[in-house]
């Protein structure tokens, strides 16, 4: 967390851009941002001694930047953000912005457990180059995270954020699904532009699309495993871990959906399901980083307590890709 003195100066610096009314941002402040497209949630590379390897981060981004992504997510779940210090998180955002073409959106994961810490991190990430803040649900006290509590939290963050805010619901990690009623209420905030929903419940995604249809609110699928279904129900894009290694294929699936080539899209989606599951639910970030090594990127180790795969797990991971024609 930033020290109080720094936080005070940050608040002072925002006085030129933030509305000081009780309602926060004036209507329409964040609504011009078009999130449509595919975003890889990039990993944070580490050295053998568990230091952040910013050089490898830049190398990966230079390679990924040649693909037709709408943008990139840094410091999301795949970025191991809970294991990084505040200064490391900010440096990752800064280095990413410098490494990426200016036409690529940079979404930065700024979520923290307290509202104040989240505001501080959001403001700081905006100052070092984030185009939007992706804010995960606070979850340590999940039993008290009612719709009212979450609405208050996100409203405060959006009121004080100098960049648009994207809600982030990832129940597999947090044990907390951002309630639909809270999403609908928050969709009315002029500086909240969308949600990344990683829960995999397509019915829920469709309901959010339906209930926010009167707002300029955008839904991003949180996985390549249900990307086709999400497009069919009204999502505008996806934040897909698999795009770190099969980026061209995930972007191809997007194109097939957008052009109505549903039979070809279905065939491709089927071939992406097992690899996607392998680098998410089954083997997680260690699995994703291992496949990055195979596909010409730098994966490397994770930070402890995440452990590398066993030989048997690595073989199972390879089979999930090879059996679908990717290796």
Swiss-Prot record:
Its EC number is 4.1.3.16. Keywords: Lyase, Mitochondrion, Schiff base, Transit peptide. It is found in: Mitochondrion. The record marks 168 as: Involved in proton transfer during cleavage. SMART domains: DHDPS (SM01130). SUPFAM superfamilies: Aldolase. Its main location: mitochondrion. GO terms for molecular function: (4S)-4-hydroxy-2-oxoglutarate aldolase activity; (R,S)-4-hydroxy-2-oxoglutarate aldolase activity. It comes from the Eukaryota. It catalyses: (4S)-4-hydroxy-2-oxoglutarate = glyoxylate + pyruvate; (4R)-4-hydroxy-2-oxoglutarate = glyoxylate + pyruvate. One of its GO terms (cellular component) is mitochondrion. One of its GO terms (biological process) is glyoxylate catabolic process. Substrate binds at residues 77-78, 198, 222. Residues 1-25 form a transit peptide. Belongs to the DapA family. Catalyzes the final step in the metabolic pathway of hydroxyproline. This is 4-hydroxy-2-oxoglutarate aldolase, mitochondrial. It comes from Bos taurus (Bovine). The lineage of its organism: Eukaryota, Metazoa, Chordata, Craniata, Vertebrata. The gene is HOGA1.
């Amino acid at each position: 967390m930033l020290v109080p003195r720094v936080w005070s100066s940050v608040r002072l610096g925002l006085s030129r851009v933030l509305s000081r009314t009780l309602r926060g941002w004036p209507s329409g402040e964040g609504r011009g941002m078009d999130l449509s497209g595919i975003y890889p949630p990039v990993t944070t590379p580490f050295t053998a001694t568990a230091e952040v390897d910013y050089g490898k981060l830049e190398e990966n981004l230079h390679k990924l930047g040649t693909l037709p992504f709408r943008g990139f997510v840094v410091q999301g779940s795949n970025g191991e953000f809970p294991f990084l210090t505040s200064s490391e998180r900010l440096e990752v955002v800064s280095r990413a912005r410098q490494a990426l073409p200016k036409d690529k959106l940079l979404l930065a994961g700024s979520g923290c457990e307290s509202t104040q810490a989240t505001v501080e991190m959001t403001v700081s990430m905006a100052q070092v180059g984030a185009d939007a803040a992706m804010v995960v649900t606070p979850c340590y006290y999940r039993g008290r995270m009612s719709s009212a509590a979450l609405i208050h939290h996100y409203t405060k963050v959006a009121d004080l954020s100098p960049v648009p805010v994207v809600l982030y619901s990832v129940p597999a990690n947090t044990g907390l699904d951002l309630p639909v009623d809270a999403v609908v209420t928050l969709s009315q905030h002029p500086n909240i532009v969308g949600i990344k929903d990683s829960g995999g419940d397509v019915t829920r995604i469709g309901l959010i699309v339906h209930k926010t249809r009167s707002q300029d609110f955008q839904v991003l699928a949180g996985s390549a495993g249900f990307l086709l279904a999400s497009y069919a129900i009204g999502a505008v894009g996806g934040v897909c871990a698999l795009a770190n290694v099969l980026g061209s294929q995930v972007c191809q699936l997007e194109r097939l959906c957008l052009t109505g080539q549903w039979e070809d899209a279905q065939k491709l989606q089927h071939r992406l399901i097992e690899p996607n599951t392998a680098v998410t639910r089954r083997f997680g970030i260690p699995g994703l980083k291992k496949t990055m090594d195979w596909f010409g990127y730098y994966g490397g180790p994770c930070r402890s307590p995440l452990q590398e795969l066993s030989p048997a797990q690595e073989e199972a991971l390879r089979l999930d890709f090879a059996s679908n024609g990717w290796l």
